[in-house]
Amino acid sequence: MTGWIRAALSDAGTIQVTQRNYGVPMRPLTGPLAGHVLIAFRGGRDLDVQEALARRHDAYLDCLRLAGLRVPDTQMRLIDHAGVQRPVIVQSAVPDDAMLPHLFRQGGTQAAIGLLDRVATDVAEFWRRIAQRPERIGLYSPLDSFAMDEDGPLFLDTFPPLISYNR
């Protein structure tokens, strides 16, 4: 997959999509990663630190799912770029018209309230389920971090992994 990521990030056929938080999402239009969003982040030279970050990301994905949040298929890979290990998130793409801000603009007030209620219910359930966990866990949950499909809310923002961290 590393080769596919490198190829997609350097391909002129990969388009930048709406920026989310700290990374720059890109969507390959062709190739094996078409149908995915790639989000490349600034990395570092300390491999031990970057590998710990990758392990935390895996643990965070597990925590999100065990706590009831639905997350599209998501992986984090470290890509070596001139000695710098860059974290790259590879996530199954969600259609633009399924993103919560788009749904708010398309529906009326009652539809928006219904969407907010579904997201709030999932977020509250997340906090209820992690309340007794010993490690520090966070959830950065602005509305643009969610999409909606026929089964309910999808949480998209898995980086940085908010698990076992210090302030």
Residue ranges and their predicted role:
Residues M1-G13:
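Juxta-kinase regulatory segment immediately upstream of eukaryotic protein kinase catalytic domains
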Residues D11-D62:
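ATP-binding glycine-rich loop module of kinase domains
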Residues H36, R70, I89, L154-L156:
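Protein kinase-like catalytic core scaffold
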Residues I39-R42, V90-D96, D157-P160:
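Short loop/turn segments at strand-loop or loop-helix junctions that form parts
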Residues D46-D48, D80-R86, A98-P101, A147-E150, ...:
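Short catalytic/ligand-binding loop motif for oxyanion handling, primarily in non-cytosolic enzymes
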Residues R55-L69, L103-D144:
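Conserved kinase catalytic-core helix
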Residues G68-R118:
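Conserved structural core of kinase catalytic domains
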Residues E135-R167:
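Catalytic activation segment of kinase domains across protein kinase-like and atypical kinase folds
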